[in-house]
């Protein structure tokens, strides 16, 4: 101990020895990608990944979205164990089979679409949701099959169908097998229409490519989350093609609503109540109680 240390009151450091820092668990805080606010992760999850400061809708996993929609303990998953195969033995920088394994390990899911049947405020409902964390929510054979099985389940039990889209489009590693899903999913909705059952499409950020060009825009009612990017090609690709500057907000949900391409915009936190009210109206039933 130096002579200076002896003279200084206790608790005041006189050397450059780093102090012990209280450990903070990783992942406890997250930065809003829009306003930059530091957000407490448990509160953000409770708020359905919507920034409480600026209202920015951040990415949410498919199971969390469906859990927020359905009544508690009412769900049964559809085609839960159905997984993709590399029929074309496709390889770019990596083998497609390797990409599948990596995506499954990172997400804990078999593929990019989760489908369930359950209850929404006591009424039967079938719903599916894309998981963008799985290969950008790309649509391959499994996504198309799960979507179609969900539509068939809705017909079997006489329930409406809701799909939350979030996708970069068709999965290029499956080639024409992927593109065929555009027709397959659209045909599945035809059966739903013949049965007189409603289909509500909820477009979230981003919904592009083959998904936006097929079932995502075929809802009896098309709803979008705020500021969602919706279109076939992205704005940068369009600008490079036409060599013109696009209007501000082009392809965002507010722009599409203004030009009649979608029916309404709904905050994610209000989506459950909004869907329950719309489905009651379409089914000519009394509005459900707020819950």
UniProtKB/Swiss-Prot annotation:
Broad class of where this protein is predominantly found: cytoplasm
Pfam families per the UniProt record, alphabetical: Carboxyl_trans (PF01039), Zn_ribbon_ACC (PF17848)
Catalytic activity entry: N(6)-carboxybiotinyl-L-lysyl-[protein] + acetyl-CoA = N(6)-biotinyl-L-lysyl-[protein] + malonyl-CoA
Subunit and interaction comment: Acetyl-CoA carboxylase is a heterohexamer composed of biotin carboxyl carrier protein (AccB), biotin carboxylase (AccC) and two subunits each of ACCase subunit alpha (AccA) and ACCase subunit beta (AccD).
Function: Component of the acetyl coenzyme A carboxylase (ACC) complex. Biotin carboxylase (BC) catalyzes the carboxylation of biotin on its carrier protein (BCCP) and then the CO(2) group is transferred by the transcarboxylase to acetyl-CoA to form malonyl-CoA.
Entry-linked NCBIfam families: accD
Protein name, as recorded: Acetyl-coenzyme A carboxylase carboxyl transferase subunit beta
């Amino acid at each position: 101990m130096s002579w200076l240390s002896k003279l200084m009151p206790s608790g005041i450091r006189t050397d450059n020895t780093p102090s012990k820092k209280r450990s903070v668990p990783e992942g406890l805080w997250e930065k809003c990608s829009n306003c930059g606010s530091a957000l407490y992760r448990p509160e953000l999850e409770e708020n359905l990944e919507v920034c409480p400061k600026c209202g920015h809708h951040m990415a949410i996993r498919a199971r969390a979205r469906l859990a927020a929609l359905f009544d508690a303990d009412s769900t049964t998953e559809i085609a839960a164990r159905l997984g993709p195969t590399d029929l074309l033995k496709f390889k770019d920088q990596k083998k497609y089979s390797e990409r599948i394994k990596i995506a499954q390990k990172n997400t804990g899911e078999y593929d990019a679409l989760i489908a369930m049947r359950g209850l929404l405020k006591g009424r039967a409902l079938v719903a599916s949701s894309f998981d963008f964390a799985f290969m950008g929510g790309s649509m391959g054979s499994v996504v198309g099959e799960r979507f179609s099985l969900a539509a068939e389940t809705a017909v079997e039990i006489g329930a409406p169908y809701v799909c939350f889209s979030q996708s970069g489009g068709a999965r290029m590693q499956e080639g024409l097998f992927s593109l065929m899903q555009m027709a397959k999913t659209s045909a599945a909705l035809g059966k739903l229409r013949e049965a007189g059952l409603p289909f509500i499409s909820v477009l979230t950020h981003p919904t592009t490519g083959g998904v936006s060009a097929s079932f995502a825009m075929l809802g009896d009612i098309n709803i979008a989350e705020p500021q969602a990017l919706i279109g076939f090609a992205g704005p940068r690709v369009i600008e490079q093609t036409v060599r013109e500057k696009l209007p501000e907000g082009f392809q965002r949900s507010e722009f599409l609503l203004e030009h009649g391409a979608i029916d309404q915009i709904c905050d994610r936190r209000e989506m459950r109540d909004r869907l329950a009210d719309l489905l009651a109206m379409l089914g000519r039933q009394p509005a459900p109680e707020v819950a």
